[in-house]
Amino acid sequence: MRTTFEARGYTVWDTTSPLFIQQAPHNTAVLYIPCVFISYNGEALDEKTALLRSNEAISHAAVRLLHLIGNTDTKRVITTLGVEQEFFLIDRGLCTLRPDLKICGRTLVGSVPPKHQQLEDHYFGKMPSRVLATISETEIELFKLGVPMKTRHNEVAPGQFEMAPIFEEAALAVDHNLLTMEVLHRVAHRHKLKVLFHEKPFKGVNGSGKHCNWSISTDTGENILDPSVKPETNPRFLLFFIATIYAVYRHGALLRAAIATSSNEHRLGANEAPPGIISVFLGDQLNEVLNAVEEQREIKNFSQHQIQSVKVGGTILDLKIATLPPISRDLTDRNRTSPFAFTGNKFEFRAVGSKQSPSFPVTLLNAAVTAALNEIANELEKIKGDKTFASLEDVLTVVRMYIKKSKPIRFEGDNYSQEWVEEAARRGIPNITSCPEAFKMMLDPVHQKILTETVPIFTVPELQSRYHIQNEKYVKDLLIEGNTLKGLISQYIIPSAFEYRKEIAESLVSLNALGMDVSSAPEKAVLERIGELTTKITQLKGDLEKAIAEVSETQDIVLAAEKAHHEILKVMDDIRGYVDELEQIVADKYWSLPKYSELLF
């Protein structure tokens, strides 16, 4: 949108996000003012502007729909967000010995140790003292900055942890999430730790995500996505619930584009995170509610038991222990394989990458839901006719219509399974497996119209610029990783292998000098395998250099992204397989890169 010599831009304070002060060196302090950033011509050059526009758009659409059903007291609606931030913490001294971790944020080579996460003994276990000191100090600093941190715990992989705050208005929650990442990075450094926000820093163990718990509230603080005791007769809940499902059905590919990054590409669909197929999980009770509404029948009895006014549980669980009270079971279990799941009174967008800002995914989700709300409001206006407000039967008629339309997106099973891949294809749900393919969804005519006309949160140039930036960032990331791997091979991996090979060769010479038969000596087999592996790695390094050169010379950034995906990534994966085998063979004293067993334990 702007050429190199056009440099003027403007910042405007976002008054919905409070100012804050951070301590700086030499007993000084810095006042930070959250702002939007626009160009001389008024184009949005940041992520905050589009998010604020989407918040305004969804508020207008939601208020319009609420007024149609008689909720005329509501003047404004806000989207709320609670962000679960996952990350790894490793020793900073060891991290500095790994150029790939320092430069790329992930290990480009490294074999999985015998023990990693298979015992499932790290999740929710006791935190190491240095980690606990780091996270608790981070929480204290964040409290001073107004960030309402709430929970912390061990995650599944060794060295992996999570922090989460109380939900807030979406734009403020995004600001606070970015602030959390910054403060955690700074505090970890003081404790001689390195925080890794990369989605897949270690191959073979779980990666990290950023679960975005999204909901809609009125200006009086009522959560619109709270099902209440009888969701089947709650018109407000039903309308907004089905609107969100329909939004994902219509624009799931757009949500896939929002989470497409070079780092998240390593995590999605890896049997540890949601797949690249966007679907919606509702749970048994709400599935039954929608099915009953669609079929115009009574809902099955779920033995609802209410504990307090804010918590609706399912059946009672009696542990048969006199000293323990019975507890109320939730109406629905969690499906951790679903990328977009309803969890009690909110939707959890689980596919967002741990390193990326939540702003863009939430912006596109808001836009998709806004379009759905407007479409549903149009239908409801037609059906209610001359009546002042729509009746419950009018609402159910419209809801029924959109239940049928959006049914293909609902899936309650295992999203990791091959059966779901095949079933999704039958339902016509796209399976987008690469970033370049996902980026193109932003300029798909249907999605582009939503973002620039129906819900105008971007101008056409703004949207095209983001498409260009996504491709450019993807290409640069892979070029950096490819060049880093080249350096690792030349400066670390091959020299280590040659040193060990020299020792084995000298051992064989000594054995031969003593008159021993070395033709079947185990040293000879090891020597030959090292030779085979180093030869193959060297050949593939040449292929990698050619791929890097070809991508670097490609002027069309979209074509360059496709080449980077198909050529650079493939060669890097091939190299890694041989290097990881070599790591298992070379004696530890010769292997100059810290191994997973040292980094994670």
Please place each PLM-identified region on the residue numbering.
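C-terminal amphipathic alpha-helical interaction region
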Residues: 393, 399-601
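Glycine-rich, acidic/polar active-site loops that bind/position phosphate-bearing ligands
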Residues: 1-197, 206-467
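Glycine-rich N-terminal segment of FAD-binding domains in flavoprotein oxidoreductases
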Residues: 201
